[in-house]
């Protein structure tokens, strides 16, 4: 067998199938941007479904790939077993209605056994097949020459996920020898059994049947091939190492962790070995996932990353690593993978920043959290229970950042379990509290009263019209049906046809009026009713509104005009953020009103001033290019193929609304927009801030609001210039001149203060007392700040040569205290840090420092004299 690196095996696989006429499909992003319902790409075939289900016809029906994948269903087993991983690479070859069973088997055998390729000893290979797959048996036995005793028939060799394509599969196993198992009485010691000797190398799936709704199977008109070979497992066999972690795909990370920790891998400590493995696995996953745009958070795929990082940090403590360090492994992962995934090294600085940020956040609470958990476990044992309550588990999650799964691992080590149901109950209570705290949401009490019973149809026509003739089809007051609303009364109603947009997708509702003969009704707000209709919150200003009344519904066009400008601007902003900051940026929330827009997005660290300037300029350039905004209805799959941005967690129907701004922005959106970007006029960023870990917020204005903002700023500039007696264009020069003047005055002030301090220090020497043979000076002085206090202290120590000195000053009801001890007295046991702490405690403060100099603060100026009197007592206590 050849000596090969993991990178060489990957490339060899792709080269082999390229020679067999396959197109090499690039590895897709781990984050399935085209399918927000899917958490991660979790297999080689996941990105090829569009070919297998016929939505897209591939240019070449023969495809091969090396697909990075993430699976997180067995996180707790990572590190415990030889081959469990959260991140792995799946090598595969696929046929979309082209070749079938014979070619798939023949090529697999050639790749594994030919000296040109892997070069396995044929005698060490066995295969499993489905008991009824005689075709596969014949190919293996007669054409490949595998003796029948090494062809094992297993019932589970059938790939079936319910209705749809299915078929038998064959798996190829490699015999690693008696060192990995020689107990032939073991019922699992066979290819396909649970053992370490016979390792599965390759799985070939023959998709030849359709599983029908009635449970029957019928032959497919076009048969497909879907194969999978785990690179990590294959590499462990080729490199003849006991586990996947001992291959060159993992050892560089383990080696770097050895250097950081000072501990050794495989040094006889199984617990430490597990820690090395957990860290190596999890940093690969996090590095690739962040590189593909995922960021740690408290939900979805972000929660998975947070859980992995915090699990790795927890295990790092077993290696005596008590500081953020995982970020240092990011470039190591990049070096290992650079041949096939150069993007990791290209993004290493950003990835490392994200990882370090998350590590630092967890380290801030980890120690306290572990202490609390230890108390919880001890208390549970005292109470003779083996269950950690959901309340305690939630407190660890909410206050100390412990993912529930991490608490469960700690509990398992202590022989305990966690009340998962109780934890979920606490989570739901928190969600309820959050919902109740949102005063601006559900203010209409949409769910109240009879609204859930209303099933009448209501059509929204507001995309294309601002006024329409309508009929009131439901009228509600105080949660109950009513026949009428009088002047001054508030209620809720539904129209059979409405131009009023209901608040959703971050866009606020339309306002406007309903008009009829003698009737004028103000529409204050519009929300979605429980059954999906637009529900109008109204106040009758004139006349009486009755159920079934015919009205003219007219929206406030001035308000709508401002809203649509801001909404289209958020789409331009979203894309500009991706262009400037990176593709990891994703929308995390938005608010679109007539006055302003607010856009929340995933990003670590403050957006720098020059970046904000670039973002703002890009948005304005797109506005000034006068780009048409096209809105269309598309099948969801077609929209995804077009590359439309979809929001993770959003539920989309089969047909979606696509908003396209030229070739610049493409999003799925149900909101209202301008027809052309020129209508926006101008875009101005007002503020950028952080609203949580990994989430930033930009607030901006457009159109008239942007003009008014800039006009106000120009007005302030003119006012400031007037006060400085200069022109606006010269104001910076004038400010620089003023700063220079202030700096000169500060220097003169400091010089004067130093002279005064020197004079006062000279006067203070007359107040020196001798206590047990030690010069002692404790005095309240009149200086402006701690810097002047230090200057005075230095003067006094120089003048006195041998002394214990304590000075205190009072400014704005705050006490500054400074203690100094000359070198000769330090050796006798006098300590400025200890002394100043005692003095400060007597006037409501605290502090400390070095033996020769220490400072403190106090809160009670009235007690300063009393505090200074303690200095003599201190000197006496030391001299004894």
From Swiss-Prot:
GO CC field: cytosol
Binding site for Zn(2+): 567, 571, 669, 673
Catalyses which reaction(s): tRNA(Ala) + L-alanine + ATP = L-alanyl-tRNA(Ala) + AMP + diphosphate
Required cofactor(s): Zn(2+)
Keywords, comma-separated and alphabetical: Aminoacyl-tRNA synthetase, ATP-binding, Cytoplasm, Ligase, Metal-binding, Nucleotide-binding, Protein biosynthesis, RNA-binding, tRNA-binding, Zinc
Cofactor binding note from Swiss-Prot or TrEMBL: Binds 1 zinc ion per subunit.
Primary residence: cytoplasm
The protein's Enzyme Commission number: 6.1.1.7
Subcellular location: Cytoplasm
Superkingdom per UniProt: Bacteria
Listed SUPFAM superfamilies: Class II aaRS and biotin synthetases, Putative anticodon-binding domain of alanyl-tRNA synthetase (AlaRS), ThrRS/AlaRS common domain, Translation proteins
HAMAP family in the record: Ala_tRNA_synth_B
Function: Catalyzes the attachment of alanine to tRNA(Ala) in a two-step reaction: alanine is first activated by ATP to form Ala-AMP and then transferred to the acceptor end of tRNA(Ala). Also edits incorrectly charged Ser-tRNA(Ala) and Gly-tRNA(Ala) via its editing domain.
Family, similarity comment: Belongs to the class-II aminoacyl-tRNA synthetase family.
Name of protein: Alanine--tRNA ligase
Organism: Bacillus thuringiensis (strain Al Hakam)
């Amino acid at each position: 067998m050849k000596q090969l690196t993991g990178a060489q095996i990957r490339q060899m696989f792709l080269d082999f199938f390229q020679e067999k006429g396959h197109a090499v499909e690039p590895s897709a992003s781990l984050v399935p941007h085209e399918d927000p319902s899917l958490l991660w790409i979790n297999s080689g075939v996941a990105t090829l479904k569009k070919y297998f289900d016929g939505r897209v016809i591939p240019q070449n029906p023969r495809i091969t790939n090396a697909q990075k994948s993430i699976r997180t269903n067995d996180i707790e087993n990572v590190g415990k077993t030889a081959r469990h991983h959260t991140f792995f690479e799946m090598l595969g070859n696929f046929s979309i209605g082209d070749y079938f069973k014979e070619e798939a088997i023949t090529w697999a055998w050639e790749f594994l056994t030919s000296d040109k390729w892997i070069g396995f000893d044929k005698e060490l290979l066995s295969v499993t097949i489905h008991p009824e797959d005689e075709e596969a048996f014949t190919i293996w036995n007669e054409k490949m020459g595998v003796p029948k005793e090494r062809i094992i028939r297993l019932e589970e060799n059938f790939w079936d996920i319910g209705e749809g394509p299915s078929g038998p599969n064959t798996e190829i196993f490699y015999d690693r020898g008696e060192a990995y198992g020689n107990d032939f009485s073991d019922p699992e010691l066979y290819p396909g059994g649970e053992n370490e000797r016979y390792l599965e190398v390759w799985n070939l799936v023959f998709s030849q049947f359709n599983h029908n709704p009635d449970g029957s199977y019928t032959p497919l008109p076009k048969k497909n091939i879907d194969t999978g070979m785990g690179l990590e497992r294959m590499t462990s066999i080729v490199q003849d190492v006991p586990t996947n972690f001992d291959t060159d795909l993992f050892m560089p990370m383990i080696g770097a962790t050895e250097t950081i920790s000072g501990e050794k891998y495989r040094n006889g400590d199984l617990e430490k070995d597990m820690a090395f493995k957990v860290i190596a696995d999890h940093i690969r996953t996090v590095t690739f996932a962040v590189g593909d745009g995922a960021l740690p958070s408290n939900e979805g795929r972000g929660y998975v990353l947070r859980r992995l990082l915090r699990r790795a940090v927890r295990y790092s403590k077993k290696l005596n690593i008590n500081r953020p360090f995982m970020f240092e492994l990011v470039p190591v992962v990049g070096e290992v993978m650079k041949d096939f995934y150069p993007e990791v090294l290209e993004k290493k600085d950003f990835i490392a920043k994200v990882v370090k940020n998350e590590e630092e956040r967890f380290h801030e609470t980890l120690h306290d959290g572990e202490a609390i958990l230890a108390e919880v476990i001890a208390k549970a044992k005292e109470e003779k229970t083996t269950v950690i309550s959901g309340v305690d588990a939630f407190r660890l999650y909410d206050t100390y950042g412990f993912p529930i799964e991490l608490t469960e691992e700690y509990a398992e080590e202590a022989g305990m379990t966690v009340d998962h149901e109780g934890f979920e109950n606490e989570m739901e209570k928190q969600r309820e509290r959050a919902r109740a705290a949102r005063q601006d949401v559900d203010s209409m009490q949409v769910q109240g009263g009879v609204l859930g019973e209303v099933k009448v149809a209501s059509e929204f026509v507001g995309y294309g019209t601002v006024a329409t003739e309508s009929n009131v089809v439901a009228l509600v007051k105080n949660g109950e049906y009513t026949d009428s609303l009088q002047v001054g009364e508030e209620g809720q109603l539904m129209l059979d046809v409405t131009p009023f947009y209901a608040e959703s997708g971050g866009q606020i509702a339309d306002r406007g009026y309903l008009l009829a003969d003698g009737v004028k009704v103000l529409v204050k707000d519009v929300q979605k009713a429980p059954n999906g209709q637009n529900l109008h919150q109204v106040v009758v200003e004139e006349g009486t509104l009755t159920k079934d009344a015919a009205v003219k519904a007219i929206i406030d066009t001035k308000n709508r005009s401002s809203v649509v400008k801001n909404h289209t601007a958020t789409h331009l902003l979203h894309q500009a953020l991706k262009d400037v900051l990176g593709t990891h940026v994703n929308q995390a929330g938005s608010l679109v009103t007539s006055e302003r827009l607010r856009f929340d997005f995933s990003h670590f660290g403050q957006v720098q001033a020059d970046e904000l300037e670039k973002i703002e300029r890009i948005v304005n350039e797109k506005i000034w290019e006068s780009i048409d905004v096209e809105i269309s209805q598309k099948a969801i799959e077609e929209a995804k193929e077009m590359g439309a941005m979809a929001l993770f967690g959003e539920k989309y129907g089969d047909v979606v609304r696509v908003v396209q701004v030229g070739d610049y922005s493409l999003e799925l959106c149900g909101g209202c927009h301008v027809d052309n970007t020129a209508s926006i006029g101008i875009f101005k960023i007002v503020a950028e801030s952080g609203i949580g870990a990994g989430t930033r917020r930009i607030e901006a204005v457009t159109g008239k609001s942007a003009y008014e903002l800039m006009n106000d700023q120009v007005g302030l500039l003119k006012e400031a210039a007037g006060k400085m007696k200069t022109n606006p264009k010269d104001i910076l020069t004038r400010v620089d001149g003023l700063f220079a003047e202030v700096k000169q005055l500060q220097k003169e002030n400091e010089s004067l203060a130093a002279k005064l301090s020197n004079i006062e220090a000279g006067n203070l020497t007359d107040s020196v007392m001798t206590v047990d043979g030690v010069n002692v000076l404790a005095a309240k002085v009149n200086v402006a700040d701690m810097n002047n206090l230090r200057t005075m202290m230095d003067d006094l120590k120089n003048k006195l040569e041998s002394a214990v000195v304590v000075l205190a000053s009072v400014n704005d009801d705050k006490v500054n205290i400074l203690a100094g001890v000359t070198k000769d007295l330090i050796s006798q046991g006098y300590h400025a840090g200890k002394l100043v702490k005692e003095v400060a405690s007597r006037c409501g403060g605290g502090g400390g420092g070095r033996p020769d100099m220490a400072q403190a603060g106090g809160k009670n100026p009235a007690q300063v004299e009393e505090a200074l009197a303690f200095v003599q007592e201190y000197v006496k206590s030391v001299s004894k």
